[in-house]
Amino acid sequence: MALKNSRNKQKRKPAIATRAIHAGEPRKRYADSITTPIVQTSTFVFADSNEIENYTRKGKTRYEYARYGGPTATIAEKRLADLEGAQDCVVFSSGMSAITTTILSLVHSGDHIIITDDSYKKTLEFCRSYLKQFAVECTILPFGDYEGLEKAIKKNTRFIFSESPTNPYLNIFDLEKLRKIADRHGVLTLIDSTFATPFNQRPLEFGIDLVLQSCTKYLAGHNDILAGAVLGRTALVDKIRDLHKSMGGTIDPHCCYLLLRGLKTFPLRVTRQNETALAVARHLEKHPRIKRVYYPFLESHPHYKIATAQMTGGGGVVTFETKGTLNDAKKFMDALKLCFIGPSLGGVETLITHPALVSYYDYTRKQRYQLGITDTLFRLAVGIEDAGDIIEDLERGLHQL
């Protein structure tokens, strides 16, 4: 009897590690190939005039032109939507293409938007500078000022945009609180969840309207492609898809293939990066030459309780400040042998960047410090190397201080 009852139970949804491999794929594979085919074409042809009319007048689903979509991209979109728990998804040629196209599809002249102040520099620049040309007002608020956020909402506010975790301080937005504020005023919520990935955080489960991902990072995971995505309910994603068809920003089929290949191992990689980042953060926090460490799953992080409540892992980025001067910071960085000096994150190689010298080189010291970008601030994006080797390399650099 117990066996019979167990058969009647609803089937358990496959785990994310399984879905990262199989979601979006037809069981019957093309030419019996186990891997997704790269459909490298600009145009999809019609057999005859009847097939054209079935497509244009009767709405038969098929492909027409690669800027509007293709088979390889469709599989990537289905898999990403499954992992994020979204109804729909559009993939783009980069994360910034996803962000800018999404924003432009949601606003009109005379509208108002709100964005938090520690969002990605290029996202802030787009909202602060370029949207003015379309007569769209942008309010930039300090991250975590929930009271100020509610006061900033106007009748013409279209959406609230933030990252979570943010770059570089890894601040965590209380997604449930954000949704409640937005719901009271009927505005949309957009979260860039690139630093978390759907493995660690799924904002849609908290009622967020749209999630953005730079698939360049953890999802593809090998530092070899650019890709982006927006995910959410179909009614919203369709608006973005329509503008995407006109704006371009189309991802290449070969990049889609590499994204799909990367997705198959992304749960394994992110699990490793979560563990390594936490080990590195704990080691640095005790180091006498380190001033401060920022990592969401450290109890010393200001948003530790929020992070552990809405995330399953802290991610692969550790931000820290060394003691000393800018010259000392340079000595530390130049002594590293394993960690590569460079921007980006989420790949298999460990990367370290110095925001003051790279992202904010064109800011005055006063401007940088107002944003919290100090002379000795570093962002470490751990790869999948051995944690002990990464720590040993950091020790090599810290020995120079």
For the regions a protein language model found, what residue spans apply to each?
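Acidic-histidine catalytic/liganding microenvironments
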Residues: 83, 284-288, 336
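Short amphipathic alpha-helical segments
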Residues: 61, 87, 226, 255, ...
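Glycine-rich beta-alpha junction loops
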Residues: 25-27, 40-46, 195-197, 217, ...
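Conserved PLP-enzyme active-site core in the AAT-like
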Residues: 11-12, 17-26, 89-289, 294, ...
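PLP-dependent enzyme catalytic core of the Aspartate aminotransferase-like
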Residues: 1-8, 128-129, 137, 155-158, ...
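Conserved N-terminal alpha-helix of the aminotransferase class I/II PLP-enzyme fold
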Residues: 43, 48-97, 122-129
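N-terminal "arm"/small-domain region of PLP-dependent enzymes with the aminotransferase-like
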Residues: 2-70
